Amino acid sequence: MSASGPEAPGDIPALPPPPQPGSGPAPPAPAAAAQEAMDGRAELPAFPRAGAPPLAASDTVPAAPEGAGAARPAAPLRPTSFSVLDILDPNKFNSRRRRCVLLGPVAPAACAPCASAPCAPAPAASGRPPRAEELERRALAGAGGVGAAGAEPPNAGDPFKAGEAETNDTNGYSSGGGGHSPSADSGDEVPDDEDDDEDEAPETEAARGAEEARGGGGGLGARGSGCQGAAETDASPGATVDEAAAPGPRENSPVAQGPPGGAAAPGGAGTTPQGTATAAKPKRKRTGSDSKSGKPRRARTAFTYEQLVALENKFKATRYLSVCERLNLALSLSLTETQVKIWFQNRRTKWKKQNPGADTSAPTGGGGGPGPGAGPGTGLPGGLSPLSPSPPMGAPLGMHGPAGYPAHGPGGLVCAAQLPFLSSPAVLSPFVLGSQTYGAPAFYAPHL
């Protein structure tokens, strides 16, 4: 036992805690070594206060001055070991805190022994009044519902605790019992405005009330240790109550509050979709109105002057185009059939507004618009008359009878078969032209 004592200073993290309290009889421990041990513990209040999990490094440092300090013959080895621990402690605590965070909901049970076993007897063994004062301050802060600012002043005098609190704040963890979830403290998307400041008070009160109900000493130890499992489980009911009770301020905030609230805690995900929906509804309405007013339903066709002149001339000839007329006109003007059709629809609407009492079935006939009783062939485009020996090629496609009905024949027969008959002036008679208006094929014309 005594042989292992001198080797302890070199291997303090690997030394198991149980053999040390009973390692040898109580020898005349040097006063300097005991004093340095007490001073070292006074300089490291973060060990019991932070409530670290009972790992080797944290157990050997408080237990070493009680039993193993007597077996060490050389006093200079003591401050060396403590200086090394002083340098390494904050990193160890941060890594343990992250392990507790990874545990999730099971973290409170895992952190309970670390809060009860090392933290409770340590103040009695060392007899340090700052620990009792800090416990009283935290209890008062928890009873009064003070936020994280009220619970952090005890850390001002401790350089290690203050550094630890700074690292926790930068990482987004709640230090000193703030009761906030990491995403709520980090503030990734939510702006730090008045609405969030107003919402923090009920959240902290609810979290502290839940923690006091679970148990005063253990809850404070778990909170001081920074194990985020307890903070998250306590903060989730507060977050749900906060979002459900005060939806108004969160809706008015410029940034949507849904995503950070949803990432805060699994318990608060029940109400976050509603908050997201209420916050996004005005945006959807605005985007909907913008899309209705500014969305181009169809690309507006910019007709050239030649296209407009040709379309106007065609409309003067006839207000209704057949399939063949529309196809030929679209091909001649380098337009699509849909563009020609829409232009004629709009032009007919304009014409009806300009001539409210006019008969829509009558052809325009060069702008004059002969009535139903007009002579056959007067409305033919290109000045086509029944006796014209050489009608233009576009005339048969735009041919209409006195009643103004389009010459819709079976398939493309009318368009293709009218050409040979209309090319011979002997066949062109008013009777033949009139018979074509009812869609009869051209090869029936001589028999009629």
Curated annotation (Swiss-Prot):
GO terms for biological process: cell differentiation; regulation of transcription by RNA polymerase II. Residues 186-203 have a biased composition (Acidic residues). GO terms for molecular function: DNA-binding transcription factor activity, RNA polymerase II-specific; RNA polymerase II cis-regulatory region sequence-specific DNA binding. Keywords: DNA-binding, Homeobox, Nucleus. The keyword Nucleus applies. InterPro entries: HD, HD_metazoa, Homeobox_CS, Homeobox_NK-like, Homeodomain-like_sf. Residues 14-30 have a biased composition (Pro residues). Residues 296-355 bind DNA. Residues 1-80, 115-299, 350-397 are annotated as: Disordered. Residues 1-13, 62-79, 115-129, 271-280 have a biased composition (Low complexity). Residues 130-139, 205-214 have a biased composition (Basic and acidic residues). It is found in: Nucleus. CDD domains: homeodomain. Transmembrane segments: none annotated. It comes from the Eukaryota. Residues 215-227, 259-270, 364-382 have a biased composition (Gly residues). Expressed in hemopoietic progenitor cells. SUPFAM superfamilies: Homeodomain-like. Belongs to the NK-1 homeobox family. May be required for the coordinated crosstalk of factors involved in the maintenance of energy homeostasis, possibly by regulating the transcription of specific factors involved in energy balance. This is NK1 transcription factor-related protein 1. It comes from Homo sapiens. The lineage of its organism: Eukaryota, Metazoa, Chordata, Craniata, Vertebrata.
